[in-house]
Design a protein with these regions (language model features):
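Pro/Thr/Ser/Gly-rich low-complexity, intrinsically disordered linker/stalk tracts
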Residues: 26-71
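Recognizes extended acidic, P/S/T-rich segments that occur
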Residues: 78-112
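Aromatic-lined, polymer-binding surfaces characteristic
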Residues: 239-449, 460
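Carbohydrate-active enzyme catalytic cores, enriched for enzymes
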Residues: 371, 410-586, 782-788, 803-882
């Protein structure tokens, strides 16, 4: 075998012994592998029931099924649910009738064994039966049933401002810790304000392009003939600068809290003035949509108004007239009815329901608690809310602590802190007793160790240079340490901002009311003996480090291939590999979330903007159906290995998100999005410590295509054939391939990123964002249906790439890769002293095997494909993969 240093590096024939004995065809499943056959794993709206055909991992499980109802103004549906030990349902263990939600949450754990369940829409035939099993490995969920929570809410007021039973103690506490003084200072700003006559965004809902709101000043707050509460986030010519709902909410809430903490009626009467003006606003705009065309309850103002009025109704009863009380009660009743109609069949059905979980849910809960006893329907609302939380929390995760939305988790912190505290107030149960919350600190740690930037898979808004967690995330970690005694959470919180939550008087109000701590009393020490790599299979991210707790010596390699697909705040980056070196970005995505239509559609959100692969110049669809997953992961002291499968990530039915995004950009979807040409894309990533990263790609298409192997760098790249070097950093990439590839390095994106919003940067609104770094595209010089790629990334100490004895040597490491696409893929790695070795596929079982000698003892770890938990309810096939 020879390598050619002309315009490319090339491995032209097979260089690996020890390969699988039988070549894989397009139809056969290679040994040890699993093939997921489902169109989607985390659908936009549920398309399959669960649980079906497997042992559940939590007891009792939540039972969920598809619902045809997809809009909040459509009539509510009613469902029946039955559970039995037999498929004939002659004996029923559980029978529930008349539920508006398309799910069932049981009240107690089930006995071990096989169970059958079914559901129906009232008046229609039963769907099912569906079977599942319960065994001793299932986690027991001991949360009290919803009726315990609902019945514990008494008629005593106030309830959400501060429980009357805690009033005196809370007043003393807040006076001592400075909360009262801070709130009173804030509340003073709301006095003597000329209140707007309307919400401009409701008045001109859905008509922002007509710019009528630009000339209309009736939505402004004014004081002493000057506008007050002006947006500091957006310039006045951008429509989001007109959002005033947060001011209405904070005005009423802060004034109510100041009233109860001080007993001074002036705060209460001012809060009532604000609330009564707000109660004159229409509950829904004329077209039932937000200014940008979403269903109105999806917008933040709807939840803010609900919470403001709930606080007023709860805390100002003694100051109201009967007429005012009736007006507020009727207003709240209608708002709660609308939200309940909006939530039903949505919260339980959507894999990604951002705004509800981020913002409106704790506000709905506040209002429903406030209205219990005064509104008969409130009990139903509270029961639904409690049960859907039990069924779906955490919304964008499962048990491993990973969060699909990346650093967008900050938008969920209020919900994660307030809702469990309110439940605990009435039940006494700690709702953080869930594997997700115990594992969440490790996700934060591995994706962004203190002193380092994040892994680049942050969802919307990646690329910030912050080396610390946001204050509210640090505060959440402090709460988790307080409630679960998690030193790693407390340590992470302290690294960002000690007492982060305590510095914000409005943070964790429900916990403060109960006298619950915001942090653990003991100071946490740095965690010890942590593995240098961690897999988060629920969200499809692996993080591999050289020196986890020492950023200046760290090399961080991350791969993403997510079962959630490309939806919500995440991007078309399946099988992308990112590299962070010494705490700084090296090989990471590019683009700007707010870079205007063309850049957002074709660069930032697109696979083109990520370190993955293009097929005929096209990338992964913007759809939940375009998903990936991580079948394999192994970790040792010298070698860590992960495999991402993005075979399904390049095909999906047309999705409305694509229409929106490419429509705004005035670009043709067909020019940028692939539809089904990809047949197989398995990416194998090995981190050979201390400084070598190996990427081995298996690529198969249904026809001859041009392949583009994409790599973005925050520094300048220089190409010499298929060798890339990084200016100013000891880093290089040698790309070997089964078909010749030519490298192109660009310094400008396909479309410039324009600062069209001017967010936090008013002066540069409308100007291009600066171009940062460079972008390499290694493209096949001829179309081919199959391609193998072997990339050797050296970061730090550099070694020559040497062809020897049918393999490749790089420093102390020897690699042998099967580069003939007609043969089964395989890869072996060994180091010079014989202390570490890896084989991708054994001939008999197709196992990946990692062998290391540590302290004179040989350690061997093995794996075949392992199905992710989220895929257990869908169709898949296996050739001895682990189910």
């Amino acid at each position: 075998m020879k390598f050619f240093r002309t315009r490319v590096f090339m491995l032209t024939i097979c260089g690996l012994l020890c390969g699988a004995s039988q070549a894989a065809s397009n139809e056969a499943i290679p040994k040890g592998e699993i093939r997921i056959l489902a169109n989607e794993l985390q659908p936009d709206r549920r398309t399959f029931p669960t649980p079906v055909g497997h042992a559940v991992d939590v007891n009792p499980p939540a039972f969920c099924w598809p619902s045809p109802r997809d809009y909040f103004l459509k009539p509510l549906l009613t469902y029946d649910f039955q559970l039995s030990r037999s498929a004939d349902f002659k004996t029923l263990e559980v029978s529930q009738e008349g539920s508006n939600g398309s799910f069932a949450q049981l009240k107690q754990p089930l006995a071990e064994g096989t169970w059958c369940w079914r559901y129906r829409r009232q008046g229609q035939a039963w769907k099912g039966p569906y079977s599942f099993s319960v065994d001793s490995t299932a986690r027991i969920d001991r949360r009290p049933p919803s009726e315990v929570f609902v019945k514990a809410i008494t008629n005593e007021r106030p309830r959400i401002v501060v429980p009357r039973v805690r009033l005196e103690a809370f007043r003393a506490q807040c006076k001592t810790n400075g909360v009262t003084a801070a709130l009173c200072k804030t509340a003073t700003a709301y006095f003597d304000v000329e209140l707007p006559q309307c919400d401009i965004l409701m008045k001109y809902s859905g008509r922002e392009k007509e710019s009528l709101w630009l000339k209309d000043k009736s939505g402004q707050f004014r004081k002493n003939n000057k506008q007050v509460f002006i947006s500091t986030k957006f310039p006045e010519n951008y429509i989001m600068s007109q959002i005033t709902s947060a001011t209405w909410e904070s005005g009423v809430v802060d004034l109510c809290r100041a009233y109860w903490l001080t007993g001074d009626e002036k705060y209460g009467r001012e809060a009532l003035r604000w609330a009564m003006r707000l109660a004159t606003f229409p509950v829904l705009p004329g077209n039932n949509t937000t200014y940008d065309g979403n269903p109105f309850p999806d917008g933040f103002c709807c939840g803010s108004y609900l919470n403001a009025l709930a606080y007023a109704y709860d805390g100002l009863q003694s100051l109201m007239t009967d007429e005012q009380r009736t007006l507020l009660r009727n207003n709240l009743a209608e708002r709660l009815r609308i939200y309940y109609a909006y939530y039903c069949n949505r919260l339980e059905s959507r894999a990604v329901e951002h705004h509800g979980w981020q913002m409106s849910m704790p506000r709905f809960l506040n209002a429903a608690i406030t209205m219990r006893g005064d509104l008969p329907e409130a009990d139903r609302y509270l029961s639904y809310f409690y049960d859907v939380w039990a069924a779906r929390d955490p919304e964008l995760g499962r048990t491993d602590g990973g969060w699909f939305g990346g650093n967008y988790i900050g938008a969920n912190v209020t919900t994660m802190v307030e809702v469990p505290a309110l439940f605990r107030q009435y039940t006494g149960y700690n709702y953080y007793k869930h594997p997700f919350y115990r594992n969440l600190p490790y996700w934060f740690l591995y994706r962004q160790p203190p002193g380092s930037v994040e892994d680049g898979f942050a969802g919307d808004g990646y690329g910030g240079n912050s080396r610390a967690l946001a204050w509210n995330v640090a505060a959440l970690l402090g709460v988790l340490d307080a409630d679960l005694d998690l030193p790693v959470a407390g340590w992470l919180s302290d690294q960002t901002s000690p007492l982060a939550g305590g510095k914000r008087p409005d943070f964790a109000w429900a916990r403060r009311m109960m006298g619950l701590p915001l942090e653990n009393a003991r100071r946490a020490q740095p965690p010890k003996e942590l593995p240098q790599a961690h897999l988060f299979p629920d969200v499809g991210v692996a993080n591999m480090h050289r020196d986890l707790l020492n950023p200046k010596n760290d090399l961080h390699v991350a791969l993403r291939s997510s079962p959630y697909g490309t939806f919500g705040h995440n991007l078309a980056s399946h099988n992308a590999v990112n590299v962070v070196y010494q705490g700084d970005y090296l090989f990471v995505p590019y683009g700007h979330r707010h870079g205007d239509g063309p850049n957002s559609a074709a660069c930032y959100r697109h696979t083109r903007g990520h370190n993955s692969v293009l097929i005929d110049g096209k990338g992964q669809p913007f759809s939940p159906q375009a998903y990936g997953w991580i079948p394999r992961f192994l970790h040792g002291e010298q070698i860590s290995y992960v495999c991402g499968d993005a075979s399904q990530a390049y095909d999906a039915e047309p999705h409305y998100r694509e229409d929106e995004i490419f429509g705004r950009a005035d670009l043709l979807i067909s020019d940028h999005i692939s539809r089904g040409d990809m047949q197989r894309f398995r990416r194998h990533v090995l981190f050979l410590r201390p400084s070598l990263i190996v990427v081995y790609d298996e690529l198969e298409a249904k026809k001859p295509v041009q392949w583009d192997w994409v790599l973005h760098c925050r520094k300048m790249l220089t190409a010499d054939g298929a060798r890339l070097t990084v200016d100013g950093v000891k880093a290089s990439v040698d790309v070997l391939s089964s078909t010749p590839m030519a490298a192109t390095v660009k310094t400008e994106p396909m479309f410039p990123a324009i600062n069209f919003m001017g967010m936090y940067d008013f002066e540069n609104q409308g100007k291009p964002f600066p171009n940062v770094g460079s972008h390499a595209y290694l493209s096949t010089t001829a179309k081919t249906p199959q391609l193998r790629v072997l990339a050797l990334m050296q970061v730090g100490e550099q070694y020559p790439i040497i062809q020897k004895d049918g393999g490749v040597e790089c420093g102390p490491w020897t690699l042998r890769a099967e580069m003939n696409p007609s043969q089964p893929a395989n890869l072996t790695v060994s180091n010079r002293d014989g202390s570490a070795a890896f084989v991708l596929k054994t001939p008999d079982r197709g196992e990946s095997v990692l062998t290391e000698t540590i302290g004179g003892q040989q350690k061997v770890v093995k794996t075949v494909d392992r199905i992710p938990d989220v895929a257990k309810d869908v169709e898949w096939d296996s050739n001895d993969g682990e189910k």
